[in-house]
Amino acid sequence: ALRQAADNAGELQAVLDRYDDERRELAEYAVAATWGRVARTGAGMDSVEALYRELPGIYKWQFDSAQLARGRRYAAMPLSVTKDAATVTADYLADNIDDAWRLWKGRQWNRELPQDLMCEMLLPYRVGDEPLTRWRKPYREWLAKLEDTLARCGNSVEAARIIVDRMGLCHYNDRLSTPHRSALDLLEAPIGYCREDCDRVLYAMRSMGVPVAVDRMLLSPDNGGSHQWNVVWDNMDRRMRMFDNENYPPTRDSLYYDRRRKGKIYRSTFAPDLDRLARYRKAVGVPPMLLNPWLRDVTAEYFGHNRAEVAIWPGAKASEENAVYLGVFAGQRFQPVDIASLKGDRAVFTDMEPNLIYAPVMADGKICGYPFMLRHDGSLHSFVPDKGSYEKVTLTRKFTPGYHQKSRFSSVVGVHVQSAPTARGPWTDLDVIDTPPAHSYRRINPDNPLTGRYLRVYADTMCKGKYGAEISMLLACRDTLGLDCLPLSVVGDDAARERYTRILLPDYSLE
């Protein structure tokens, strides 16, 4: 870090020289952690922040079409990259070290928190590549009314729950791809997706002395996307407790499960995990996400240690350079989430979620062995096709509906679909959705021929979804297969026509 600091090396050295007590080790850790850390800033990000502050609008916390176009233009603007080691000041690091030290020594629940965990869960001055800010005091002032309650609290999980109850939601909006937002921007405008929600939780918890981190899956076996959540160190049994600020509050309930299949789980770290990176040292063409130095494999904390040894097809020509990876099915193919060690013509995988189908793959995702499942009892089942026996099946769904999918399905409960001869009515129910649909579509076959020219979709009470009823498309067809569609137009003012035409009519074009 001192070499990377160049002309700023004096600032980093000043931090080290400031301490001659236990804080010296924290200072060494913080200085070392500046290695490779950067902030990404620019006029485009400033404009994105201004855009977030225009919400909520008529679409609640979602952008309208004009805002989204602006946001994507801003997000594509060039960014400036500044290295922490070359720019951070001694005062900034020292203030962070002193504050984290005070909370480590002062909170009841931190009395047995090991120093290595303290350095990763209380000490960090940053989360990702956000602009650096002095965030600890503003967050503590925001949560100041909780201080007396927290002072009496002896359990870190309970302290986390108290803070979560005060924080409220981070309003969901995942339409823009940007660097991490700054701590103060998240405090002022809590908007984003799971990343922003987790970042905001980290700042709040650490400002009050609660040891927390972020765990993540790089690729979801359920939907192919990534996801992250928070964990809090439980001082009662010295283990991590996962929680989701919005849906699953911190709890010591050992039966807690968020219903997501995960495959492999990594923890975001403050200092780089060089031991994990060493496994990829000789491999060629490693997927970039696996070379993130600030990830640590913590799958065993969730599922225990396990091991699977599978045969590799001879044609794969596997070697340390042409490495084999653990593949989870995501995005219509198996994709790498961890590297294997080779044992002759076999690949050895360790620490994975049981009862999930994996496949050995090469760096490009090409399968190099039969898919397999490691069961809870440690037994291994390989899916070897029997070409002498065939059976036809009808596949309607690869996975059971996940949390978000169930939420979207249930959002339409209470919706009426009606017809009328005029735009003013009288309206007649064609269908009332009283239970969540089993699929992402609903087909309505009227008992009698329709005589009304107008259709209306509405809910007489607020639907259960975050944004009301979530309906993406509306078709009126002459046939039952949805091939012979009738032309539709939207009745209403300009705003209604703009919004609902985009959402409901599949042939609508912006051009």
PLM features per residue range, with description:
Residues 1-2, 148-166, 174-184, 189-284:
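Hydrophobic/aromatic-rich core segments of domains that either
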Residues 363-390, 474-479:
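Structured interaction patches on ligand/partner-binding surfaces of diverse proteins
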Residues 390-511:
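Aromatic, loop-rich ligand-recognition surfaces of beta-strand-rich domains
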Residues 278-306:
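Beta-strand-rich domain onsets/edges
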Residues 306-316, 397:
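A short, amphipathic beta-strand motif
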Residues 321-340, 417-419:
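Short amphipathic beta-strand segments in non-cytosolic proteins
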Residues 345-366:
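Short Pro-Gly-centered beta-turn/loop motif in secreted/extracellular proteins
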Residues 3, 7-189:
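Secondary-structure boundary elements
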